[in-house]
A protein has these predicted regions:
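Bacterial Sec-dependent N-terminal signal peptides
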Residues: 1-21
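Interaction/scaffold regions that mediate signaling and macromolecular assembly across diverse proteins
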Residues: 21-247
């Protein structure tokens, strides 16, 4: 009898552990579908009215952090959604703002000069900031340049915020779609001809991420409608830090 009880307890514990490891991104997906339009602009006032739902999702992220048993796609989807959800939450915490960079001017924390350095995130008991997620985790652990088209820093010149969350089972296709969306948006990247282009500053800031195995032109040609020639003349567009908000 005791052996049966022990077996049942062990089985329930196993199922409990599996349940804890599963994170549903559906609540965030519902928020994005409701408050982000097709161009990626955000209704921050609307999300603010349902901030409890966003906070509930963030609580799930805090308590169900990636485990070694997770697949790479499960981990990466988690961290991309976490970055975007926490960025929205940061905007709401200081709303109204004209730019996310205005938050850096508002805060009075020693040695913290930008909104990306504010330790307002707590995952697995560890305090972290948006830079920790992007540079310390995502760029460090995943050799995936397309993340630059998925992480959205709440600015007009950032890649558009997709009106859906990222899910492990569709992650590869979603990242490719985000890359194509970004490179075919003439306000972000202007391909004048096969010999000349004005690109987003993202390709200047993170050029090394895109050129580990190929040239920048060859990387762009995988997702752009215009095929750049080798040694094309490339310039970089000014970055618009205005808030990506619906008017």
């Amino acid at each position: 009898m005791n052996r049966i009880v022990v077996l049942i307890f062990a089985t329930l514990s196993m199922f409990s552990l599996v349940a804890q490891e599963k994170v549903s991104h559906k609540p965030f997906d519902e928020i994005l579908q409701k408050y982000v339009d097709e161009t990626g602009l955000v209704n921050y006032k609307g999300i603010g009215q349902e901030r409890a739902k966003l906070k509930s999702y963030l609580k799930v992220l805090e308590e169900n952090f990636p485990k070694d048993s997770w697949s790479d796609d499960e981990k990466l989807a988690y961290w991309i959604n976490a970055y975007n959800a926490y960025t929205i939450d940061l905007i709401l915490e200081h709303y109204p703002v004209k730019s996310i960079k205005d938050i850096g001017a508002k805060i009075k924390i020693p040695f913290v000069n930008t909104p990306w350095d504010i330790k307002f995130i707590k995952i697995d008991g560890e305090e972290m900031d948006l830079n920790n997620i992007e540079h310390g985790i995502i760029r460090k652990q995943f050799d995936e340049p397309r993340i630059h088209f998925a992480l959205v820093c709440a600015a007009i010149s950032c890649p558009k915020l997709q009106n859906k969350a990222y899910f492990p089972e569709t992650l590869d296709a979603q990242l490719s779609d985000a890359a194509k969306d970004f490179l075919t948006d003439e306000t972000k990247n202007e391909f004048v001809s096969t010999k000349k282009a004005y690109l987003s500053m993202l390709f200047n800031w993170y050029r090394g991420d895109f050129t580990k195995e190929t040239s920048l032109e060859e990387y762009l040609n995988k997702y752009s409608d215009v095929q750049l020639e080798k040694r094309a003349r490339i310039g970089f567009k000014d970055y618009d830090w205005a808030l990506n908000e619906q008017k």
